[in-house]
Amino acid sequence: MDVEERLSLVLRYPTEEVITVEELRELFQGGYKLNHYIGFEISGFIHIGTGVVSMSKVVDLQRAGVRTTVFLADIHSWLNNKLGGDLDTIRRVAVTYYVETFKRIIEVLGGDPDATRFVLGSDLYHHNDEYWFLLMDITRHLTLSQVRHSLTILGRKMGESIPLAYLVYPPLQVADVFALGAHIPHGGIDQRRAHILARQVADKIRFYPLTVDGKRIKPVALHHRLLPALNISSKPSSKEELSELKMSKSIPQSAIFVHDSPEEIRQKVAKAYCPPREVEYNPVLELLRIAAFREERKTPLVIKRPEKYGGDVEVWKYEELEAMYKEGKIHPADLKAVTAEALAALLEPVYKFFQGPGAKLLEEMRNIAITR
């Protein structure tokens, strides 16, 4: 695979941006062994945004020859009071439900679950004096204003009254990038500010400098799209507003969970926001794109329609679908029907896992109080 083919894998949907593309191209051209990481708070059930969208980029990176890592951020979750702030519960859920779910999704998407490393935050920090020196070093090079500005990482507006612990979170996240040796830190577009901080301190820190071939570099940040909540009532006016209106595991009606049954998926999609002719921030279109158009199709997607409205339609590419919907040639009800079926087919192996060997994991999650 040549450099441009590798680059196209990284840049394809659902990638929103890479900072910077030219830096990544140079790293690929150099033939360096590159490390990736994406971090997750440990909280409630994994939905399709956290699971399928994120892991689709992990699979793309695997194919591009990048070593991938999923970071299970137990300490961050504790600081942010997830799962009631119970650290033991957070850790247990991280290494059981989260690991098993992500592995199943990677496999469903055509990747290799064994090729991705899973790292628990506590394990990275344990008996690691250099990490704590790194963290302190990072704080020496950040201002209070910079840290407060990045607090949307936590889903909290910086003008609110917040515990001091929350101010530790952004430097901690920046430190993880370097401690993991991540040339490509990855997350949703809502993680952008933290990754910008990492780039800003990259040439200043003394501990865990990020290097290739002995040369210090800045991390190349990779950000994927956020799935809008199913129950949004209007189009977001900005990316910042979208981060507030993304799918949320603590609001069940806003999200499709990866363990949902086909009938639950149909019911949720049927109620989803899907205005006629509107293609921007349309959660149903986004869901169909990730479920049916991530890979080049070998057969057309068939959208069933009544004969009086023109009969069935065959679609090969997402761009065709979007254009037809924008022109009003596809009714929202027909779009919802095909989306629900495509999602149910994609997630069927995950659903069956949680109906069988993974049932105990799901039951434990149902018994845990979920905090947002």
Swiss-Prot record:
GO molecular function terms attached to this record: ATP binding; tyrosine-tRNA ligase activity
Residues that hold ATP according to the record: 249
Catalytic activity of the protein: tRNA(Tyr) + L-tyrosine + ATP = L-tyrosyl-tRNA(Tyr) + AMP + diphosphate + H(+)
InterPro entries, per database record: aa-tRNA-synth_Ic (IPR002305), Rossmann-like_a/b/a_fold (IPR014729), Tyr-tRNA-ligase_4 (IPR023678), Tyr-tRNA-ligase_arc/euk-type (IPR023617), Tyr-tRNA_synthase (IPR050489)
Keywords: Aminoacyl-tRNA synthetase, ATP-binding, Cytoplasm, Ligase, Nucleotide-binding, Protein biosynthesis
EC class (word): ligase
Cellular compartment(s): Cytoplasm
Any Pfam family matching the protein: tRNA-synt_1b
GO CC annotation: cytoplasm
Function: Catalyzes the attachment of tyrosine to tRNA(Tyr) in a two-step reaction: tyrosine is first activated by ATP to form Tyr-AMP and then transferred to the acceptor end of tRNA(Tyr).
Protein name in the entry: Tyrosine--tRNA ligase
Record gene name: tyrS
